Amino acid sequence: MTHSTQQLSPEGVAEGKRGRLIRELVNRDKTPLIILIMAAVVGVVTGLLGVAFDRGVDWVQQQRLLALANVADYALLVWPLAFIMSALLAMMGYFLVSRFAPEAGGSGIPEIEGAMEEMRPVRWWRVIPVKFIGGLGTLGAGMVLGREGPMVQMGGNSGRMIVDIFRLRSPEARHSLLATGAAAGLSAAFNAPLAGILFVIEEMRSQFRYSLVSIKAVFIGVITSTIVYRYFNGERAIIEVGKLSDAPLNTLWLYLLLGIIFGAVGVIFNALIFRTQDMFVRFHGGDWRKLVLIGGLLGGMCGLLALLHGNAVGGGFALIPIAAAGNFSIGMLLFIFIARVITTLLCFGSGAPGGIFAPMLALGTILGTAFGLSCAHFFPQYGIEAGTFAIAGMGALFAASVRAPLTGIVLVLEMTDNYQLILPMIVTCLGATLIAQFMGGKPLYSAILARTLAKQEQARATVIAQEPAVENTPQTGR
């Protein structure tokens, strides 16, 4: 018996250790089933919200354009009508935000990041309707805003709504479903499930609490929201630019150069956004009437610009395939780029309910196409296709501004269905991110959140300072 025990002892000990490790790993994964079920519910709700919001914006825009088309032959009518309709739609969005849910202004993504750190409140009962209806107004007016910011915020708020409705008390459930809604919202906005997952894991890395529960919940929510989106809209790529040729290896240095350019552009772009936000705060000074009036003027301006040069306004998704196909000259591309930079800064910096993803992707496409056409002119021996630089530029500006290169790469590849361009995308986005970091630029959403928290603390300090001091006078008795 002693001999047998001594012979089996080393193997038995090793086997026992492996068994304990496996049991510990299995027992550690005590994922509450209710959280995973609720994650699926959050994904379905967010997907339905995304489809409704997308179709609602399209309907409002179509009705506005149809009304203008009916009076297109009457110049004395079409110009005033274009201004008035867009102004009224925009004013509705600004009014709802300023009067009922100030946290619904702007993109909304920084609000979700703040909520994940328990620094910002989540009032879903007012944010969801205000963001939905207000977004219909501002985006329907033709302002240079995107649909993805509202979808991320409404998705995150939907997650918190499910938590409150089903009375899930655990902090893990509250955090996981908030992140799930945000990821599902981005997935539903762009039909890009992997980008939705990466956005939460990479861009919100400082706020997201990594655990088996939260990762599973995010995956399930993104899957269900994507299924809902594709059930109603089909499985085609959201931006159809056709299949582009792969980039030859001897042209990769040009993509690195493009990334360097976009790194600098991203830092400057972010700085201009912050300056524009400060400028509008000085203009309205917190007075909601002035803010609504400013919003009406901006909306009316976009309505007029839509008649003059439609490519200068709108989210930009319709412009991307046209620009990537090389239908504009270099001079026209630069003109559109400058015009859209100005309109993007004005619309987003004013605090209108709407995102900046889509306008940013359009800007990257335009400048990338201009760079590609220039390279094709100076280096004809490479046989360059300008569209590949358009796709690379689309992700590069996002990577430099938001500081999430992996999300930018995957998002653009999923949206355009051009996965063969992954190598030039990596070179361009990594170069843009490194240059932006070297120049000291701050990630866009993190910087906006920091500014919001600073204003929150300042307002709190002002309230405390204005409270009357209570004097403790000694009580005397007889």
UniProtKB/Swiss-Prot annotation:
Primary subcellular site in the record, as a coarse category: membrane
Periplasmic side: 70-76, 233-252, 310-329, 377-386
Motif Selectivity filter part_1 per UniProt: ranges: 106-110
Primary gene name: clcA
PANTHER family xref list: CHLORIDE CHANNEL PROTEIN
A Pfam family this chain is assigned to: Voltage_CLC
Domain of life: Bacteria
One GO MF term attached to the UniProt entry: voltage-gated chloride channel activity
Family, similarity comment: Belongs to the chloride channel (TC 2.A.49) family. ClcA subfamily.
Entry function: Proton-coupled chloride transporter. Functions as antiport system and exchanges two chloride ions for 1 proton. Probably acts as an electrical shunt for an outwardly-directed proton pump that is linked to amino acid decarboxylation, as part of the extreme acid resistance (XAR) response.
Membrane side Cytoplasmic: residue ranges: 1-32, 117-123, 167-176, 202-214, 282-287, 439-478
Record membrane topology: Multi-pass membrane protein
Intramembrane segments of this protein: 109-116, 177-189, 193-201, 387-401, 402-404, 405-416, 417-421
Reactions catalysed, as given in the entry: 2 chloride(in) + H(+)(out) = 2 chloride(out) + H(+)(in)
Native organism taxonomy: Bacteria, Pseudomonadati, Pseudomonadota, Gammaproteobacteria, Enterobacterales
Site, as annotated: Mediates proton transfer from the protein to the inner aqueous phase: E203
Name of the protein: H(+)/Cl(-) exchange transporter ClcA
Disulfide bond entries: none
Cellular compartments annotated: Cell inner membrane
Organism in which the protein naturally occurs: Yersinia pseudotuberculosis serotype O:1b (strain IP 31758)
